Regions:
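Alpha-helical scaffold segments that flank or form the walls of functional sites
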Residues: 66-151, 181-197, 442, 446-454
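Histidine-centered catalytic micro-motifs
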Residues: 50-62, 229-238
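Divalent metal-coordination and catalytic microenvironments
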Residues: 7, 27, 56, 112, ...
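His/Asp/Glu-enriched, well-ordered alpha-helical/loop segment
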Residues: 258-261, 265, 307-394
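Metal-coordinating catalytic core of metallo-dependent amide/deamination hydrolases
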Residues: 124-271
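Active-site gating loops and adjacent loop-to-helix segments of metal-dependent hydrolytic enzymes
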Residues: 63-99, 125-134, 161-181, 238-263, ...
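N-terminal metal-binding scaffold of metallo-dependent hydrolase/deaminase domains
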Residues: 1-37, 47-48
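Active-site microenvironment of metallo-dependent hydrolases
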Residues: 1-19, 359-454
């Protein structure tokens, strides 16, 4: 058992002072007591917060962050960005993927993300053929997460088609494509391996309605664990909505709700172009809206109607997706700022009994992220995994703030530099802003970039 003492900590009931926390050998919180003592405990150096789950990641895309910011096409969009992504993914080896993912996860930890849902759809070799072990690349992701020390929900993706109605895949998608049968075999191969890994679990994932058929969705759901998370990209771009209407006469979210039992297991990634009726369906189903603000802005996707969704009790979380940014602060700040820009008003996302915008944003992302990852995380609470971050207690903004003002100061006037220490599964992974493996990881990652882009 390890004991820790925080002068200020954000508990489910709110901010508390002089909090003693005890963690067992399995990395689980076993005791939390406010107004307690520090006897025999490690003193934490600043405000203590639950670690943030990152509910949407494509690890390999970190290698191309910043490469698509070159003007030239007046109609530049997600679809033109995708062409660059296809060219990059065609080159990456298993070793390179492992290096990229480890670097990414270290950077996430330093920003305050303590777990990640990896939406993993690169399955095959550069020619589109399965590896000797079809789980080769998925296992590289698991190994990278273990090496970095981040929690992981691995989401192997079923990706079979290039468009609605079962269109044949194109050459750029050759590394992604699986049949339903092979996808279920991949799940079976990974399940016992991840079950032995601390802080790792497995979920289901459909790339999008355009990449799978209705029959495939039904078959996978029928053959799988009824408790595990289910993730899908949906309604990210207007073109996707238009194409779905042409195929089915229904919008993507409308089609999904009419043809599938969507419940709290589901994470609807992006859902950018949800209309009012679909927003209501999402909120009532208690599915998670997986919002990736910096990526959606980078791709020019649009703005999710978060004010209306939150007002109806909707649940949401954040993800860094293409990793143009790896900042908890940026994702939450732009979740709020996007609504302000759309509505031309300030302070848009807050609760009926919670006027502090920072607290509303942080709580929503904790709860939604934990639900989307399907793990016992997202709160400093007995029985949950000991995942947390310690902010810099010497920072002037934080040292002079109290209660929920700490979150407002951090999220709207601060940044990643204020994340001092990070603990995952009861183990320190970042101390004084540094990860023990970052120097070696930086060197390896630099070489991979030179090899891929040179």
């Amino acid at each position: 058992m390890s004991a820790f003492f925080a002068e200020r900590a954000l508990l489910p009931s709110g901010w508390a002072n002089n909090v003693r926390l005890e963690v067992n050998a399995d990395g689980v919180l076993t005791h939390i007591q406010a107004d307690s003592h520090a006897d025999g405990a490690e003193r934490l150096s600043g405000p203590l917060l639950p670690g943030m789950p990152n509910l949407h990641s494509h690890a390999f895309q970190r290698a191309m962050a910043g490469l698509a910011e070159v003007a030239g096409n007046p109609n530049d969009s997600f679809w033109t960005w995708r062409d660059l992504m296809y060219r990059l993914v065609g080159k990456i080896s298993p070793d390179q993927l492992g290096v990229i993912a480890r670097q990414l996860y270290i950077e996430m930890l330093k920003a305050g993300y303590t777990s990640v849902a990896e939406f993993h759809y690169v399955h095959h070799d550069n020619n589109g053929q399965p590896y000797a072990d079809p789980a080769e690349l998925a296992l590289r992701i698991s190994q990278a997460a273990s090496s970095a020390g981040i929690g992981l929900t691995l989401l192997p993706v079923l990706y079979s088609h290039a468009g609605f109605g079962g269109q044949a895949p194109n050459e750029g998608q050759r590394r992604f494509i699986n049949s339903t049968e092979n996808y279920l075999k991949l799940q079976s191969r990974l399940q016992p391996i991840l079950a032995q890994q601390p802080a790792q679990s497995l979920g289901l994932c459909f790339h999008s309605l355009r990449a799978v058929t209705p029959q495939q969705i039904s078959e996978v759901l029928a053959a799988s664990d009824k408790q595990c998370p289910v993730h899908i990209h949906i309604a990210e771009q207007q073109k996707e909505v238009d194409d779905c209407l042409s195929w089915s006469g229904r919008r993507p979210l409308q089609w999904l709700y009419e043809n599938t039992e969507v419940d709290q297991r589901w994470c609807l990634v992006h859902a950018t172009h949800a209309n009012p009726e679909e927003v209501t369906l999402m909120a009532k189903s208690r599915a998670i809206a997986g919002l990736c603000l910096t990526t959606e802005a980078n791709l020019g996707d649009g703005i999710f109607p978060a004010v209306d969704f939150l007002a109806q009790g909707g649940r949401m979380g954040i993800g860094s997706d293409s990793h143009v940014s790896l900042s908890v602060v940026e994702e939450l700040r732009w979740l709020e700022y996007g609504q302000r820009l759309r509505d031309q008003r300030r302070n848009r996302l807050y609760g009926a009994n919670q006027p502090m915008v920072g607290r509303t944003l942080y709580d929503a992302a904790l709860d939604g992220g934990a639900q989307a990852l399907g793990q016992a995380i997202g709160a400093l609470e007995v029985g949950k995994r000991a995942d947390w971050l310690v902010l810099d207690g010497n920072d002037p903004y934080l040292a002079t703030a109290s209660g929920d003002g700490i979150l407002n100061r951090w999220l709207f006037a601060g940044g990643d530099r204020q994340v001092r220490d990070v603990l995952v599964n009861g183990q320190w992974v970042v101390r004084d802003g540094r990860h023990a493996g970052e120097e070696e990881s930086n060197r390896a990652f630099t070489q991979v970039l030179r090899d891929l882009l040179g």
